[in-house]
């Protein structure tokens, strides 16, 4: 279990809303704008469009409207950088301090979620900008060490796929320490933005996308890019490790078949997407209601977001909506969900010294390897005892220099002595051979054989010394390579400290300072507006009784309008719930028919006694969604079956 800093204060899910510009299809349909935003007051006003064919009887009544208030709102002319600096950066900074953080995009298909989260190469979205911020921070934290690991997973038709390895049918597991996690999901150490960009590009190429009437590149799956950031800091001589987990989630959009024109596989995908989003909506509702049972396990998406919704995480919901009147129902539904979500209370805490942190283990492993290498180098002493050659033997970056021979000082002296003796023996043998050619009696055959035997022994001794030195060389190279491989997993700040990057980082910091000033100006402006509203209220209190009566009458009319709006909203909610119930009833009826059909087939072809035997050894595995059968040595009831 990781230690938490303090008890962890309550922190509501933050919600920001972004509206995209009109697209060509909406312009061709003659759609009107129904979204009005006040960036200062953080309000979204949704205007109900006047229905076509409405006569003069309704012309006196203004279209109804609904006002929502969120943590931040962004009109269609807002930029990616503006959205990131003002809303998303706070989540990233929390992760850098050791909190879990989640940023997820929510909205109907074609509303701009993927554009906001991913963006384009020349206009990066929240995910690339998040990593830019992470490595800016790492470059500035001079005395801290960092280990950053990334993974990319897709939920397609309720199947988990690793987008970086292609592995499918991954399983969800739950652990008292880790919480909910994906078994066998690959984690990739990353050292800079370019490395992460490659992973994102590789993962996006594997994502399921398809064209619909609403979106030419509609995401047919949910994707989660997860980053684990381990940070080691020395405080008062003690090493402190904090681990932040960042989930960047791009949800597939909710769909209506009559608008998307989905058929075949697209329709099946849409059904799975809508089911998981309905479960997400149900989880949000239950959390707001304070229900004891939260149906996280009803879908893989909600199980993975379990900590993000009501748990140990700072969470930002990025709501994407369309401005067009043709999407009024979907926009209203999206804004309602978002309005509920902002009431969810999380309990984020700093994750200190978790047991599964890898940075200390990796650092200790590197230290151990360096000690082993130093021992080998000290023993070998570069073959000469020279400090200069010893330093040249290993460059500290996994490369062994030419100065490292692999011999110890004693071995080198011994080999040199053996080589001198061998040289003398060879010369003596040549001399003996020449003497025997001139006179066979000058040198006996025994003397020559003894000399040849001595030469062989010397050669074997030299070869044995060379073999040991070679083994020592190979061992040193292997250890040096392991050191470099493990060091490469840690973020190398030298790579992040190039001149161009430092300039860009300085610009981003200046930009952030301007954002802080802008936020302060917006806060003061909001206070002035509220003060003006209070002044007007005081003026109302000082009016004459007649004016007060008129004011009361106006308020009464306003309350009547609000009551009408609430009734209409209630009617819409009931209609939406009725549609959802109808979908669930249809699905349930189909499942019942399928079960009855299977039962009928079984009853026709499998005798009842065999059915009972099969049922007695069968058990259902909820986690793996599969039947398991107990093996028994004998089953009398099954005798002769098949």
Curated annotation (Swiss-Prot):
Positions with a binding annotation for Mg(2+): 114
Residues spanning the signal sequence: none
Consequence of gene loss (knockout): Morpholino knockdown results in aberrant cytoskeletons. Most often the external portions of the caudal and posteriolateral flagella are missing with only cytoplasmic axonemes remaining, but in some cells all four sets of flagella are defective along with missing or reduced median bodies.
SMART domains: KISc (SM00129)
Coiled-coil zones: 415-475
Xref: SUPFAM superfamilies: P-loop containing nucleoside triphosphate hydrolases
InterPro entries: Kinesin-like_fam, Kinesin_motor_CS, Kinesin_motor_dom, Kinesin_motor_dom_sf, P-loop_NTPase
Stated name of the protein: Kinesin-2b
Organism: Giardia intestinalis (strain ATCC 50803 / WB clone C6) (Giardia lamblia)
UniProt lineage: Eukaryota, Metamonada, Diplomonadida, Hexamitidae, Giardiinae
């Amino acid at each position: 279990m990781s230690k938490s800093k303090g008890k962890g204060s309550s922190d509501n899910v933050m919600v920001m809303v972004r509206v995209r510009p009109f697209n060509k299809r909406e312009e061709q349909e003659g759609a009107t704008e129904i979204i009005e935003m006040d960036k200062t007051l953080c309000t979204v006003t949704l205007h109900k469009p006047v229905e076509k064919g409405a006569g003069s009887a309704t012309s006196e009544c203004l279209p109804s409207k609904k006002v929502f208030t969120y943590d931040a709102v962004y009109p269609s002319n807002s930029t990616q950088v503006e959205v990131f600096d003002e809303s998303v950066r706070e989540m990233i900074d929390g992760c850098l301090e050791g909190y879990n953080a989640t940023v997820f995009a929510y909205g109907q298909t074609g509303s701009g979620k993927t554009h906001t989260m991913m963006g384009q190469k020349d206009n990066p979205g929240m995910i690339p900008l998040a990593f830019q911020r992470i490595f800016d921070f790492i470059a500035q934290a001079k005395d801290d060490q960092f280990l950053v690991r990334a993974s990319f997973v897709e939920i397609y038709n309720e199947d988990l796929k690793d987008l970086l390895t292609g592995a499918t049918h991954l399983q969800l597991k739950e652990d008292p320490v880790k919480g909910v996690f994906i078994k066998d999901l690959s984690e990739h150490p990353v050292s800079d933005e370019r490395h992460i960009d490659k992973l994102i590009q590789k993962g996006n190429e594997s994502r399921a996308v398809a064209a619909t009437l609403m979106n030419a590149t509609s995401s047919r799956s949910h994707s989660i890019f997860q980053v684990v950031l381990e940070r080691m800091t020395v405080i008062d001589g003690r090493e402190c490790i904090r681990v932040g987990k960042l989930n960047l989630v791009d949800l597939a959009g909710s769909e209506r078949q009559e608008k998307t024109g989905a058929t075949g596989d697209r329709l099946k995908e849409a059904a799975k997407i809508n089911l998981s989003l309905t479960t997400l909506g149900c989880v949000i509702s239950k959390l707001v209601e304070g229900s004891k049972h939260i149906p996280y396990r009803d879908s893989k998406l909600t199980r993975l977001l379990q900590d993000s919704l009501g748990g140990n995480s700072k969470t930002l919901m990025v709501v994407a909506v369309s401005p067009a009147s043709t999407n009024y129902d979907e926009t209203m539904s999206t804004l309602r969900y978002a309005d509920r979500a902002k009431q969810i209370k999380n309990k984020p805490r700093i994750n200190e010294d978790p047991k599964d942190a890898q940075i200390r283990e990796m650092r200790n492993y590197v230290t151990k390897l360096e000690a082993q290498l130093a021992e080998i180098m000290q023993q070998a002493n570069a073959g000469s005892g020279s400090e200069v050659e010893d330093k040249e033997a290993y460059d500290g970056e996994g490369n062994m220099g030419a100065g490292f021979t692999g011999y110890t000082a004693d071995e080198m002296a011994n080999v040199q002595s053996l080589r001198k003796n061998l040289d003398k023996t060879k010369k003596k043998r040549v001399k003996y051979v020449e003497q025997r050619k001139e006179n066979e009696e000058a040198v006996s055959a025994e003397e020559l054989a003894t000399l040849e035997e001595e030469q062989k022994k010397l050669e074997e001794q030299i070869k044995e010394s060379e073999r040991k030195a070679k083994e020592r060389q190979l061992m040193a190279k292997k250890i040096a390579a392991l050191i470099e491989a493990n060091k490469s997993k840690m973020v190398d700040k030298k790579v992040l400290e190039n001149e161009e990057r430092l300039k860009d980082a300085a610009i981003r910091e200046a930009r952030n300072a301007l954002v802080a000033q802008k936020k302060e100006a917006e806060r003061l402006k909001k206070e002035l507006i509220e003060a003006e509203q209070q002044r007007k209220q005081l003026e109302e209190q000082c009016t004459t009784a007649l004016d007060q009566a008129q004011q009361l009458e106006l308020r009464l009319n306003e309350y009547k309008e609000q009551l009408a709006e609430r009734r209409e909203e209630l009617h819409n909610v009931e209609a939406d719930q009725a549609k959802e119930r109808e979908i669930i009833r249809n699905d349930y009826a189909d499942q019942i028919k399928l079960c009855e059909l299977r039962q009928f087939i079984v009853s026709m072809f499998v005798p009842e006694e065999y059915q009972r035997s099969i049922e007695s050894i069968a058990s259902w595995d909820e986690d793996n969604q599969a039947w398991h059968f107990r093996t028994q040595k004998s089953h009398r009831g099954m005798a002769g079956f098949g």
